[in-house]
A protein has these predicted regions:
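Shared catalytic-loop signature of beta/alpha-barrel
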Residues: 58, 82, 98, 267, ...
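Metal- or metallocofactor-binding catalytic centers and their adjacent structured scaffolds
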Residues: 58-136, 140
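Structured beta-strand/loop patches that form or line metal/cofactor-binding pockets in enzymes
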Residues: 36-66, 70, 383-391
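Tryptophan (W) side chains
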Residues: 16-18
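Metal-dependent enolase-superfamily TIM-barrel catalytic cores that perform enediolate-based chemistry
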Residues: 149, 154-290, 295-296
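Glycine-rich, aromatic-flanked loop segments that form ligand/cofactor-binding clefts
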Residues: 123-167
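Conserved, mostly hydrophobic/aromatic
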Residues: 38, 62, 84, 122, ...
Length: 434
């Protein structure tokens, strides 16, 4: 008798099935036996996309979770196999919070480190796996939706933006060849007015551009001349002249400037009534960021390169920023991003989710955006969305008239296309439960 009771107390749910209880009107989970276990962790890379890394989490019950991260994938991949896999293999994948706490690590626990990026990809895969175990989309597992869809803005990159190397700079802008109708980086440099009209025709009412980067590289971010400042302002002025205030415009500064020059640029942008100016200074000295934010009426938004709730808490407590931006593949995954969003909500600060990386992150972000009340806009890159994203995955979050909604399928709803795994440039690494 005692042994039977002990066995029952140790039994866990795997997989979890929804069964309706008509007498109370609630859904419940049904215990189907022993806990699910992770049996293998697999990473996947394509030479054509050297910044992307996917993670498959395999279970003993045949379910698979898919995660993704972006930028410097080799280091994140090594962390996944050398640090995360030895702990996670054999574990119940549905105990996500416990795994997140254990994997926080002695090093790399803040910022968008290799450890954080690897942990982010695994966390996204764990949530996807939970969705498949329960036959539910992620947004329902988060507590349900506070909205049915959310507005998108277009980051005006082209098809090959940041494709060739893991660096942020004008050499990696992907200019020079046209791969389709949405070469939006070239467009904002030479015909920003036409670009704005093109986006509005699709129902997209927000756009982000970064014409200051050339001047930043020329002076290493230490100075901008009046001529260079005027040249960089031209695309913003063309947009306003062409479409007025029907388009929300954001300026991306890529953390390239010193404090006085960043402030000079922000003040020059003030009359243009931007939605935000993003990452004006390098994020290694928060006092400089705070000084810039408090010294301009232009709204300042930051955060996509940060990771971990403690890191974001320092930004939020600054009480000077207009918007906190989160990248789910860099900040700690869905679990951490949700906690950061809650902290921001307590400070009455809105959040926005980053996407200039990969299709899985876009889908996971869209699910989280359905649940997070203080999220008001989701980034997208239409050149990616209507271009190479569709070459890699089975489906994408639907976008209609500038609004995005999550796929209805379990988990985040995406799977890598079978032909991706058959490509000659596909590289797979696998750690298995011994």
């Amino acid at each position: 008798m005692r042994s039977n009771e002990a066995a029952r107390s140790q039994r866990r749910i795997a997989p979890w099935n929804w069964t309706a209880k008509a007498c109370v009107g609630f859904a419940s989970f049904e215990d189907n036996g022993d806990a699910m276990k992770l049996t293998a962790i697999e990473t996947i890379r394509l030479e054509e996309f050297p910044n992307l890394l996917w993670v498959y989490l395999h279970t003993d019950q045949g379910l698979v979770g898919l995660g993704e991260t972006f930028y410097g994938p080799g280091a994140a991949e090594a962390h996944i196999h050398e640090v995360i896999a030895p702990y996670l293999l054999g574990q119940d994948p549905l105990e996500i919070d416990r795994h997140q706490a254990h994997l926080l690590g002695y090093l790399g626990f803040v910022g968008s480190s290799a450890e954080m990026r690897g942990r982010s990809a695994v966390d996204i895969a764990l949530w996807d796996l939970w969705g498949h175990a329960t036959n539910q989309p992620i947004y329902r597992l988060l507590g349900g939706a506070v909205r049915d869809s959310i507005r998108v803005y277009n980051t005006c990159a082209g098809y090959r933006y940041v494709r060739s190397r893991p660096t942020q700079g004008t050499a990696n802008f992907g200019l020079g060849t046209s791969a389709g109708p949405y070469e939006d980086l070239d467009a904002f440099l030479v015909r920003a007015d036409e670009l704005a009209h093109s986006l509005l025709e699709m129902g997209i009412t927000g756009m982000k551009i970064w014409p200051f980067d050339y001047a930043a590289e020329a002076s290493q971010g230490q100075y901008i001349s009046a001529a260079d400042l005027g040249k960089a302002l031209e695309p913003f002025e063309r947009i306003r002249k062409a479409v007025g205030k029907t388009m929300d415009v954001m300026a991306e500064l890529h953390s390239l400037w010193n404090r006085p020059t960043a402030l000079k640029i922000c003040r020059a942008l003030e009359p243009l009534n931007l939605l935000w100016v993003e990452d004006p200074v390098f994020m290694d000295h928060l006092h400089s960021l705070e000084e810039v934010a408090r010294s301009t009426t232009a709204p300042v938004a930051v955060g996509e390169t940060r990771g971990g709730r403690a890191d974001f808490r320092s930004l939020i407590e600054m009480d000077a920023l207009s918007t906190i931006i989160l990248d789910l593949s860099w900040c700690g995954g869905i679990s951490e991003a949700r906690k950061v969003a809650m902290i921001a909500e307590a400070w009455h600060v809105p959040v926005a989710f980053h996407d200039c990386s990969g299709p899985v992150v876009l889908a996971a972000s869209t699910h989280l955006a359905m649940n997070v009340r203080n999220c008001f806009i989701q980034e997208m890159v239409r050149a990616f969305y209507y271009g190479w994203y569709g070459e890699l995955v089975t489906t994408l979050p639907p976008i209609e008239q500038g609004m995005i909604r999550p796929p209805a399928a379990p988990g985040h709803g995406l799977r890598l296309l079978p032909e991706v795994l058959k490509r000659s440039d596909c590289r797979r690494r696998r750690s298995e439960l011994s």
